[in-house]
Amino acid sequence: AYRVDIKAFSEDFYRKVCGARLQPVLDSAVLARELGMHVEVVTLVIPGQNDSPQETGALIRWIRDNLGEDTPVHFTRFHPDHRMRDRGATPVAVLERIYRQAREEGLRFPYLGNVSPHPWESTYCPSCGALCIERYGYSVIFRELSGESCSRCGERIPYVRAGG
C-alpha cells in the first residue's frame, strides 16, 4: 500500500508552506498506481489555506481522473498544534461539504478523519450503502464484508488490513 499526503492542490501553498513542489507528489502517486499498488490519499484540510470549494474540487477531480474513482481519500481535520497556531480547527461542516463534493464528483471512497465519532470515518458500500467497515477512533469492526467485497451486494471494497 502507498499512502500519499497531498497537502494542498496549489504550487503556491507547496512553495510557501512546505518549501517543496506539488508536481513530484502527484507524479509519485500516479507512478504507485501504475505499478499496481493500492494508493490512498490523505489531505489535511487547513482553514483558509486549502479548503476552498475551487481547490478541493480541483483536487478531487485530479484524483478521480488520474488515480481512479475507487481511490480512498481521507480529508482530515486540522488542529492548531505544533507550528500553525494562528487559526482554529477545521469546522466539521467544512469537512462534510468536502465529503459531499467528493461523492458528487464521483469518488466512491472518501473519508473524514480526526473527527471521531463521525459516520463518514467508516466504509460504506457505494452500490447498496451497507456499512462494511466501521471505524471509531482507532477501533475497526468489519461488518458487511466478505473477503474484499460487500456481503450484501458483492461490490468490491478496496482496503488493506493493518499488518497485511
Please report, for each region that a protein language model flagged, where it lies by residue.
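Conserved AdoMet/S-adenosylmethionine-binding subsite of the radical SAM
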Residues: 1-90
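Auxiliary Fe-S-binding modules of radical SAM enzymes
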Residues: 49-164
